[in-house]
Amino acid sequence: MAKPIMIQGTMSNAGKSLLTAGLCRIFTQDGYRVAPFKSQNMALNSYITTDGSEMGRAQVVQAEAAGKAPDVRMNPILLKPTSEKGSQVILGGKPIGNMTTTEYYAHKHNLLPHIKRAYESLSQENDIIVIEGAGSPAEINLKRDDFVNMGLAKMLKAPVLIAGDIDRGGVFASLYGTVMLFDEDERKHVKGTIINKFRGDVEILKPGLDMLCDLIHVPVVGVVPYLHVDIDDEDSLSERFSKKGPLGLIDIAVIKLPRISNFTDFNALEHIECASVRYVSGTNELGNPDLIIIPGSKNTMGDLKWMRENGLEVCIKKHAAKNKPVFGICGGYQMLCENLGDPYGVEHGGEMKGMGLLKSTTVFEKEKTRTRVMGTFSKVGGIFNGLSGKTFEGYEIHMGYTASEEGNEGDSSLSNLAEISGNEKPDGMQKGNVYGTYVHGVFDNDEILSEIAAALMKEKGLEYEKHTFFNLKEYKEKQYNLLADALRECLDMEYIYKVIEEGIENGNNETNGY
């Protein structure tokens, strides 16, 4: 059976996901069989495994760092918010329905056996399990039915390291307050703290670290600097969205929908050296981009209504009327249609007018499509005609289908897909310079990136030599190794290994982590 180590954080975005990924890579480099585990993740960023199961992207990253194929056992429960008060509940990789917060808390005790089975199964195949907590472990109103933080640590007898984000301020208060709010049986699990996202001279910080240790009787395992590694990380979402910089020769605007999902679709675009990728949420931010992308959404009708009310829909239509390209992915593709129907109340229920840029209709259904695909672009028209015949890989996660309207002669399918099952089907639609697809990950292909860059540069009268940008797999491996190297420099790994070996019975909390 595997030995556990758990990373908790004083708050959301404290850096738990990245620290977990880094430890997974370190332990793997050191020759151990390693797997990540997060009992419950709440995120709009998800991934489809080879067997069609859906799981959180953070655990996919951690699995890759551990050299493992993503496995839904690593994230048995995924909550995908559909509104301010409700989420779609994914259990064991499959949706079991939408629930309000109240309904979920009434139901969650039924989920505990699924968590135990998933963990025990992983434990039999690995030497170390790196567990990630969720949010803050000191939410005293949620302790009774907790199975994501200290409730899980107690169930699995896991030692805990608690991370605090010093970049946002108040790290000593948050670490002290978190530990002091723990019950006595919870405190015995806490074997160290980590100061995360530090900028500056550690020497100036040391007096505070000593005082913190004296107050909570828990050692500081390390001070982690603000790391600049390019890893698909839930915690970096707000930073990615707010990043400002000069416009590139190519200006790509991604609409920052309120319920944007699978934002990792656009990470690869940031590797086009002559391009800038901006996330915009208002007409005052849109400007005059060369390409507008409407991303996936967990609530297509709600986010279309939001765009309609804030004026972005009109701006996108004007952009398309100038024969400038618009690309919709999944929910964004659905918004481009003439009509949207929701006969089963999957989202809002009823019918809604779409943007009308593609002559098609979307109908939401109860069953969710979840599959990995291989695709080949059809004969593509418009600015991106160079994509014709190019191949790609990706995955589908959506409710319902989109069909061309009767008598429509102007639009055609964008690509042909082959599912893992062997089933083949057309996907997406195109008309002029408006394109839509259900496939996530369509840009994660070097040849496709080069074609898109060349087309946009040519449209502006600029020369562009098609070339290789990067090998995505090799690039990710390099980033995971950089993360591991950085953590080895600043964490007391000898102490962490000792904690893993001795578990919660370890009473000698001596470390020189800073």
Curated annotation (Swiss-Prot):
Question: What name does the UniProt record give this protein?
Answer: Cobyric acid synthase
Give the protein family. Answer: Belongs to the CobB/CobQ family. CobQ subfamily.
Q: Which NCBIfam families match?
A: cobQ, PRK00784.1
> What does this protein do, in the record's words?
Catalyzes amidations at positions B, D, E, and G on adenosylcobyrinic A,C-diamide. NH(2) groups are provided by glutamine, and one molecule of ATP is hydrogenolyzed for each amidation.
An annotated Gene Ontology molecular function:
catalytic activity
Extract the PANTHER family matched here. Answer: COBYRIC ACID SYNTHASE, DETHIOBIOTIN SYNTHETASE
Keyword Nucleus on entry: no
Q: Mind listing the GO biological process terms from this record?
A: cobalamin biosynthetic process
Q: Where is the active site?
A: C330 (nucleophile), H440
The organism's superkingdom is given as: Bacteria
- Pathway it acts in? Cofactor biosynthesis; adenosylcobalamin biosynthesis
What organism is this sequence from?
Ruminiclostridium cellulolyticum (strain ATCC 35319 / DSM 5812 / JCM 6584 / H10)
